[in-house]
Regions:
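N-terminal positively charged helical leader segments and presequences
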Residues: 1-69
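Fold-independent oxyanion-binding glycine-rich loops
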Residues: 8-9, 20-21, 43, 82, ...
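A short acidic, often aromatic-flanked loop/helix-cap motif at beta-alpha or helix-coil junctions
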Residues: 11-12, 144-151, 167-169
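Glycine/charged-rich beta-loop-alpha catalytic/anionic-binding loops adjacent to active sites
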Residues: 16-18, 73-77, 179-182
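Flexible, charged surface loops at secondary-structure boundaries
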Residues: 33, 151-157, 177-180
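Glycine-rich nucleotide phosphate-binding loop and flanking beta-alpha elements
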Residues: 46, 86, 166-170
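RNA substrate-binding interface of SAM-dependent RNA methyltransferases
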Residues: 70-161
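Active-site/ligand-binding-proximal alpha/beta "capping" segment
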Residues: 159-182
């Protein structure tokens, strides 16, 4: 089943065009033809659609009906120091699949990689959302300092700090204790 993120407003009986990139994907990569079905989604839900035609502007689709409402997702943020591209891509993909709502790249004293390609990260987030059957697409913040992040962190939120050298209070133990609490 082909699922595509659709940033425009979606409603039944709407006729719209896919982007050129999405049109290339459905026509040339997935080889969908006129009359084939696909799904489009945004933060409001998921709709079934049919390809009406391939045009210069892109594939023209008709939205048929809503098949799924938006999900009630937990407000999970993932703050991380920028790292090299391949491990960063992995973090973004898996975080999206696991339900992260916001990615926050943090600059600290020991951060080696000082910038990330936000446009590329957004593309990875959309692709991971499409593949993992999510309705929402997580946000990616601009780089910020650790001090700024901590000053804006919600007072009623839980903050888990992961340290590769920590042996006693590892993430598994902390989360299992939290689940056991009423």
């Amino acid at each position: 089943k082909i699922r595509l993120y659709f940033s425009d407003k979606i409603q039944s009986d709407l006729v719209s065009h896919l982007t050129k990139e999405q049109s290339h994907y459905v026509k040339d990569v997935m080889r969908l033809e006129k009359g084939d079905y696909l799904s489009v989604f945004n933060a409001q839900g998921e709709w079934s659609a049919i390809i009406e035609n391939y045009e210069k502007e892109g594939a023209r689709i008709k939205i048929l009906k809503k098949v799924r409402d938006k999900d009630n997702e937990k407000n999970i943020w993932l703050a991380f120091s920028p790292i090299k591209q391949n491990p960063l891509n992995f973090i973004i993909q898996k975080g999206t699949e696991l339900g992260v709502q916001k990615f926050i790249p943090i600059l600290s004293e020991r951060t080696i990689v000082k910038e990330i390609n936000i446009t590329r990260v957004k593309k990875i987030i959309v692709e991971a959302s499409e593949q993992s059957n999510r309705i929402s697409v997580p946000e990616i913040n601009n780089l910020e300092t650790l001090k700024n992040f901590l000053s804006q962190f919600p007072k009623n939120g839980y903050l888990l700090f992961c340290d590769i050298n920590c042996e006693k209070n590892n993430l598994k133990n902390i989360l299992s204790k939290k689940i056991e609490e009423p």
